Amino acid sequence: MAKLITLGEILIEFNALSPGPLRHVSYFEKHVAGSEANYCVAFIKQGNECGIIAKVGDDEFGYNAIEWLRGQGVDVSHMKIDPSAPTGIFFIQRHYPVPLKSESIYYRKGSAGSKLSPEDVDEEYVKSADLVHSSGITLAISSTAKEAVYKAFEIASNRSFDTNIRLKLWSAEEAKREILKLLSKFHLKFLITDTDDSKIILGESDPDKAAKAFSDYAEIIVMKLGPKGAIVYYDGKKYYSSGYQVPVEDVTGAGDALGGTFLSLYYKGFEMEKALDYAIVASTLNVMIRGDQENLPTTKDIETFLREMKK
C-alpha cells in the first residue's frame, strides 16, 4: 500500500444551493475542501494511504475539517490547530455568469492555513511517504507555506506538483516566476497542469508543446483539458482520454479528483492509460454533485461506471 503526504490549506466551502449571483442566494451547503485535502481523499479511495500537513483554526470549522478528513481515512496526525487565526472559508457561485462554470469567492487572508511553515514539516514523517504532493496554491498563500513546501520537497524521495494557479492569490507574473523556480530546483515524478496554467508559465497553450517543455522538469506529465478529458505524457509517449457528457452541478475540485485518482492508481500498478481512463471517471462523477470530496469514487465504483457508460 503506497503512502502519499500532501501539504496545503484546508478550507470550508459554502456551495450555493441554487445557481445564479450570490447576492440572490439565501442557502448554502457546507463542505470540507482544499486542493491537497481533495487529493488525499481521492488517493485513499483507490486503496492507498494519505496524510496531510496543514493548519486549521481553533474553531468549529477547523474541528469540522479534522473530523471529516479523519472519517475519510486521512492521517490527520500532522494537522495542527492554530488558536491565533481562523480556518479559511470560501463561497461558490454556480452557473453564473457562465453556464456550467463555477466561481470561488475566498475569505482566507490571514487564515490558519496560510500560517503553515517549515516548523510544521516533520522530517521523519515526510521520509515515510512514497510521494509528497503540493500545489501552486500552497506556494501562493504565504511565504512560510512556500518554505514548508521547499523543506518537504528537499526531504521527499518522490515529488508531485499541481500548478493550480489561482489569480486571486497572486499575479500571473509572480505565479510564473515562483513555479519555474520550484521546477528548476526539484525534479518531479509527476507534474499535473492544464493549458491555462501552461500559457501563464511557458507562454504556450498547445498541450504537446507545453508537455515537451515541461519534460525537462518532470518524469510524468498530466495535462488536464477540462470537459475534453486529459493527456498523460511519459517515456516519450502520449495517451489521450476523452471526457464524458454528464449533467454538471459544480466543477470545483474536478481536477483534484483526476489528479489524486491517477496518482493512486499509478501506485497500484495500473498502466498509464488505464490509470488516466479511471481518473477521468473520478473527475466526471465529481462534477455531478456539490462538494469536492463526497462523490469521489472507489475503484469498484469506477468500474461500474465504465461498464454502463459510453463516451
From Swiss-Prot:
Where is substrate bound in this sequence?
34-35, 106-108, 166, 253, 256, 292
Q: Which Cys residues form disulphide pairs?
A: none
Cofactor(s) named in the record: a divalent metal cation
The UniProt keywords, alphabetically, are: ATP-binding, Carbohydrate metabolism, Kinase, Nucleotide-binding, Transferase
Q: Which residues form the active site?
A: 256
Which terms in the Gene Ontology molecular function aspect does this entry carry? Answer: 2-dehydro-3-deoxygluconokinase activity; ATP binding
Q: How does activity depend on pH?
A: Optimum pH is around 8.5.
Superkingdom, natural source: Archaea
> How does its activity depend on thermal conditions?
Optimum temperature is 80 degrees Celsius. Extremely thermostable.
**Which pathway is this protein assigned to?**
Carbohydrate acid metabolism; 2-dehydro-3-deoxy-D-gluconate degradation; D-glyceraldehyde 3-phosphate and pyruvate from 2-dehydro-3-deoxy-D-gluconate: step 1/2
Catalytic activities: 2-dehydro-3-deoxy-D-gluconate + ATP = 2-dehydro-3-deoxy-6-phospho-D-gluconate + ADP + H(+)
Give, as one word, the top-level EC class. Answer: transferase
User: Could you say which EC number(s) this protein's record lists?
Assistant: 2.7.1.45
Q: Describe how the cofactor binds.
A: Mg(2+) is the most effective ion, but it can be replaced with Co(2+), Ni(2+), Zn(2+) or Mn(2+).
For the ligand (ATP), the binding residues are 164-166, 224-229, 253-256, 283
On subunit structure and binding partners, the annotation says: Homotetramer.
**Entry function:** Involved in the degradation of glucose via the semi-phosphorylative Entner-Doudoroff pathway. Catalyzes the phosphorylation of 2-keto-3-deoxygluconate (KDG) to produce 2-keto-3-deoxy-6-phosphogluconate (KDPG). Can also use GTP, but not ADP or AMP, as a phosphoryl donor and 2-keto-D-gluconate (KG) as a phosphoryl acceptor.
Family assignment? Belongs to the carbohydrate kinase PfkB family.
For this protein, the record's NCBIfam families field holds: KDG_KDGal_kin (NF040938)
Name listed for the protein in its UniProt record = 2-dehydro-3-deoxygluconokinase
User: From which source organism is this entry?
Assistant: Sulfurisphaera tokodaii (strain DSM 16993 / JCM 10545 / NBRC 100140 / 7)
